[in-house]
Amino acid sequence: MMERHITKEVQIGNRWIGGNHPIAIQSMTNTKTEDVAATVAQIKQLTKVGCEIIRCAVPTQEAAAALTEIKKQITIPLVADIHFDYRLAIAAMEHGADKIRINPGNIGSRERVKAVVDVAKERRIPIRVGVNSGSLEKGLVEKYHGVTAEGIVESAMDKVKLIEDMGYDNLVISIKSSDVMMCVKAHELIAKQTDHPLHVGITEAGTLISGNIKSAIGLGLILNQGIGDTIRFSLTGDPLEEIKSAKLILRTLGLRKGGVEVVSCPTCGRTRIDLIGLANQVETMVSEFPLDIKVAVMGCVVNGPGEAKEADIGIAGGVGEGLIIKHGEIYKKVPEAELLPALRYELEHWSED
């Protein structure tokens, strides 16, 4: 079993990260933060599927002011994402942000950074120091002859030291790159240099397919070394998909229990049902159930029962009929049209099993 990189404990609103606390799943809204109704609606949807920390862009004073009302209507910690204008960071904290994300390098002078730190210190609000490979300082690019993991880490640690020298260490660090292996190496390096909690993600990962693959490889390699306290799957698309992917990778790595895992066969010439459609329907349906079980969806009654042995429950389709399989044994036969309702019934009564 992997040995976890133990970091300092940091409180973000009603949630603790770091230490031995579970790795928290984070996402970011894609609504206009000023649109309180739309932003709250999206946060509630994300919370329902398992988002545990939410970040909102704060590009204007109007967006900062909207945080007050947003906070009243949500139940998970709210992080304000700030770029360039230190006054927005201060306003976001005054309007209830549980954490702020800044890059001290683009906030401005040392005095402006200190103004932000002073308010954070007064309110005990954690600061996430974020550094991306795309915004690496020219001096570090020249020093390392290009954008490198070493340069990213040095940039982040310089900014952390800047804030620590101001007498504040309630920090979270984020170092990101769209280059997967560079991002992995950077996390390996920084984990040896700091005990501040680390937020892990692959930035600009891409659309659903490419983004999931890149994020799964990158986050998988990082998390499997015990590194990481919060994670985000950055996908170009519906943020709800980010949460599904994040939950799955944590479960796959054995870092989190709970949630129904669906396994399904890849189909072959023996398949006699619309297995692709059925598997997708099952995956959508099981997300409603707070169970810690494995569900198998198989395409034929020949190999289905054997292949579903490792699952807690499964279904296997045939011509006009199908099987319900429980704990590797055929439980009952049902008409094909009743496979999905029969599975739902079994899941609804699983606690009675």
Identify the residue ranges that each predicted region occupies.
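N-terminal amphipathic alpha-helix/helix-capping segment at the start of soluble metabolic enzymes
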Residues: 1-27, 121, 284
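Active-site mouth loops of central-metabolism enzymes
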Residues: 20-38, 57, 76-84, 140-153, ...
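Hydrophobic faces of well-ordered beta-strands that scaffold small-molecule active sites
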Residues: 23-29, 54-56, 78-82, 100-102, ...
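Glycine-rich, proline-tolerant flexible connector loops at the mouths of alpha/beta enzymes
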Residues: 30, 35-36, 47-70, 101-109, ...
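Alpha-helix-loop-beta-strand connector modules within alpha/beta enzyme cores
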Residues: 60-82, 115-127, 187-198, 282-284
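Hydrophobic or amphipathic alpha-helical targeting/insertion segments
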Residues: 87-128
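Glycine-rich phosphate-binding active-site loops on the catalytic face of alpha/beta enzymes
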Residues: 96-110, 202, 225-239, 317-330
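Catalytic alpha/beta core domains of metabolic enzymes, predominantly
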Residues: 132, 140-287
